[in-house]
């Protein structure tokens, strides 16, 4: 604990922080919950399943050095953009993606964070479920929000945003101020 606290202060106690984990031998592993979901979206959005999956995955790892078991709710890298209206699509395993919604810079004022979004509610439910099953077993972190430039790229489309960096610099700077 002292070493990690020193790390965040850019200090060194006795050695650098070393974090890595290994899979436990198969005979020491617990079964990973089997998904009975009918769609990838249903599986991604199931808070209890995601919490049980996190517990099994972390139980099946050995945390070495200064590593700590950490799980976080996850709906993919563009969930923040979905809170601003981008349709969110879920892949079978590993990632999700959105469709851009900002076709014209004049429409940026119509984008607002949806505090009642089902995705935000799902992240809250996952956080609560992970806190319940992880109590005394692992740390629960926050989702990776991908705000700022990542969110703007999803809202506008990455290739379009790249071209916008030539013709719409002021709009980009303004948008980054509130994303």
Q: What is each of the regions a protein language model found here?
A:
Residues 1-91, 170:
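N-terminal basic, low-complexity leaders that serve as flexible interaction/assembly modules and, when applicable
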Residues 78-179:
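Active-site-proximal, glycine-rich beta->alpha crossover segments in alpha/beta enzymes
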């Amino acid at each position: 604990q002292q070493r990690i606290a020193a790390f965040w202060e850019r200090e060194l106690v006795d050695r650098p922080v070393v974090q890595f984990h290994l899979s436990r031998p198969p005979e020491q592993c617990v079964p990973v919950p089997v998904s009975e979901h009918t769609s990838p979206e249903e599986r991604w959005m199931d808070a209890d399943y995601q919490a049980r999956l996190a517990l099994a995955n972390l139980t099946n790892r050995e945390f070495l050095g200064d590593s700590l078991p950490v799980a976080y709710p996850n709906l993919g890298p563009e969930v923040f953009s979905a809170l601003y209206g981008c349709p969110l699509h879920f892949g079978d395993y590993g990632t999700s993606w959105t469709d851009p919604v900002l076709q014209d810079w004049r429409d940026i004022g119509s984008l607002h964070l949806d505090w009642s979004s089902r995705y935000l509610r799902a992240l809250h439910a996952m956080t609560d479920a992970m806190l319940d099953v992880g109590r005394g077993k692992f740390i629960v972190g926050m989702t990776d929000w991908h705000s700022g430039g990542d969110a703007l790229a999803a809202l506008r489309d990455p290739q379009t945003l790249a071209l916008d960096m030539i013709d719409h610099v002021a709009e980009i700077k303004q948008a980054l101020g509130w994303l």
